[in-house]
Regions:
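N-terminal secretory signal peptides
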Residues: 1-42
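Compact alpha-helical subdomains of small soluble proteins
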Residues: 36-118
């Protein structure tokens, strides 16, 4: 497992999940889909946000990817869609709605809370 994932806070984990899901949904190549889904699952394993937040992001990704992004030459810009998605404020809205850092008492480990909610 990538060591960096242990250093991300809850917000970073959730945004990285959203980006992974977007990439996996944006491309038809099985290798890309599989890698993106494995990455998304890793972020879920380390995160503490509710499952409803992940489901809500999946729905928002599906809607976002319906937007038409074309380069000057007419080629699709799927990665750009995903970058715009995670920077659009949509992911932050969902995170804020389900933010696991709102209540320290819900955490079993105070040190983990301090690390993940910085």
């Amino acid at each position: 497992m990538c060591e960096n994932i242990r250093n991300y806070n809850e917000n970073e984990l959730f945004h990285n999940f959203a980006y992974s899901i977007c990439i996996g949904s944006a491309f038809d190549t099985q290798e890309v889909k599989s890698d993106a889904n494995r990455s998304a699952n890793a972020y879920i394993q380390f995160g503490n946000i509710s499952i409803e937040a992940y489901e809500e992001i999946r729905n928002k990704v599906d809607s976002w990817l319906k937007k038409e992004y074309k380069s000057k030459s007419g080629k699709s810009l799927q990665v750009m869609k995903c970058i715009d998605f995670i920077n659009s404020g949509e992911v932050e809205k969902v995170f804020s709605k389900y933010d696991p850092c709102k209540n320290k008492e819900n955490w079993l480990d105070a040190e983990e809370y301090d690390k993940r909610c910085r």
